[in-house]
């Protein structure tokens, strides 16, 4: 099977939303996600343009370098597949994430979906999604795609290299 496209999530894969959120509100976003006061912080986070200036996620540059190599040397398409966290601030978050990518010189196409559950709609048997959220990966896999749960760059690179190497050897 030929891998035709790799989708990269942004938050928790390339950029460090979690750290910035914790620095500002002294809580991790995951602990707040299901509580009503998350929306208070969420509004502030968006209105202060925080997505534009997030730090790199540990290993994010290394992962991006390898994915760029796959794009340039093997013709594998690369796109961002990231969530805006809902309709309320969708346009603002999409713009801020584009600013972040532009500031890092990342020119791949950006797909910003309103909710993470929508990511499964991008699944195909020849596409890979690298994402840090278990239910997103489960849904992507169930929809026929190849999901890599990203927790640490070394493991993600091993899985990605294994899939791509298998793909290259199948062409020989």
Positions of PLM-derived features:
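Substrate-recognition "cap/lid" segment bordering the active-site pocket of phosphatases
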Residues: 81-127, 135-137
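Short phosphate-binding/catalytic loops that engage adenosine nucleotides
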Residues: 75-76, 106, 145
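A short, conserved beta-to-alpha structural element at the edge of catalytic cores
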Residues: 36-42, 148-168
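Active-site neighborhood of HAD-like aspartate-dependent phosphohydrolases
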Residues: 1-48, 142, 152
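Acidic, Mg2+-coordinating phosphoryl-transfer loop and its flanking beta/alpha structural elements
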Residues: 128-160
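Class I S-adenosyl-L-methionine
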Residues: 65-68, 98, 102, 138-141, ...
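Substrate-recognition element of Asp-dependent hydrolases with the DxDx(T/V) motif
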Residues: 54-55, 60-94, 101
């Amino acid at each position: 099977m030929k891998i035709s496209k790799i989708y990269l999530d942004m938050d928790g894969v390339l950029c460090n939303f979690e750290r910035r959120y914790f620095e500002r509100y002294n809580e991790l976003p995951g602990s707040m996600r299901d509580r009503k006061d998350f929306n208070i912080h969420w509004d502030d986070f968006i209105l202060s343009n925080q997505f534009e200036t997030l730090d790199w996620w540990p290993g994010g540059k290394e992962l991006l370098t390898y994915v760029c190599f796959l794009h340039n040397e093997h013709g594998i398409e690369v796109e961002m597949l990231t969530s805006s966290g809902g309709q309320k601030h969708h346009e603002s978050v999409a713009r801020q994430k584009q600013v972040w990518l532009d500031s890092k010189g990342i020119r791949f196409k950006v797909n910003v979906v309103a909710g993470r559950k929508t990511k499964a709609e991008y699944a195909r048997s020849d596409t890979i999604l690298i994402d840090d959220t278990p239910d997103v990966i489960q849904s992507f896999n169930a929809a026929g795609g190849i999901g890599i749960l990203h927790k640490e760059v070394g493991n993600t690179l091993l899985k990605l290299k294994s899939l791509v190497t298998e793909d290259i050897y199948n062409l020989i």
